[in-house]
Swiss-Prot record:
Gene of this entry: ribH
Enzyme's top EC category: transferase
EC number: 2.5.1.78
Taxon lineage: Bacteria, Pseudomonadati, Chlorobiota, Chlorobiia, Chlorobiales
Family: Belongs to the DMRL synthase family.
Protein name: 6,7-dimethyl-8-ribityllumazine synthase
Length: 155
């Protein structure tokens, strides 16, 4: 018995990608952008095929990501942001809605929207996940986007 195995490759050559980035906690968000751009370049993509959309906060990421996906200009969207827990329930609400909204936007548009939103307990954890001790989640999200576009192309 032979079962066909289909998976995406990691070539971004010719791929058009939108990065949607929240400005809140921008000093960390910019590191996520740098990680994503680095990943796309390392896998054959070019800056000419990328666009960066900046929105106020993580709550707006799903709306802007969906709009970019529906534009027909992009093969994938990468949503990047930073949500750090504070002393109120605001963190839980924003983290849940951003996560749910990004997933819903991807399902509704059938365009891969990679989730690169940090949800951390404190500033130190966010910094670690934006390029220091724990890798760069922007880089990881870009890898997901690239792989998903190539998987979709084989379906």
């Amino acid at each position: 018995m032979h079962i066909e195995q289909i998976e995406g490759t990691l070539s971004a050559a010719g791929m058009r990608i939108a990065l949607v980035v929240s400005r809140f906690n921008d000093f960390i968000g910019q590191k996520l952008v740098e990680g994503a751009v680095d990943c796309i370049r390392r896998h054959g993509g070019s800056e000419e095929q990328m666009a960066i959309y900046r929105c106020p906060g993580a709550f707006e990421l799903p709306m802007v990501s969906k709009k970019a996906a529906l534009s027909g200009k992009y093969d994938a969207v990468i949503a990047l942001g930073v949500i750090i827990r504070g002393s109120t329930p605001h963190f839980d609400v924003i983290a849940a809605e951003a996560t749910k909204g990004i997933a819903q936007a991807s399902l509704e548009t059938m365009i891969p929207i990679a989730f690169g939103v940090l949800t951390t307990e404190n500033l130190e954890q966010a910094i670690e996940r934006a390029g220091t001790k724990a890798g760069n989640k922007g880089f990881d999200a870009a890898m997901t986007a690239i792989e998903m576009v190539n998987l979709y192309r084989q379906m």
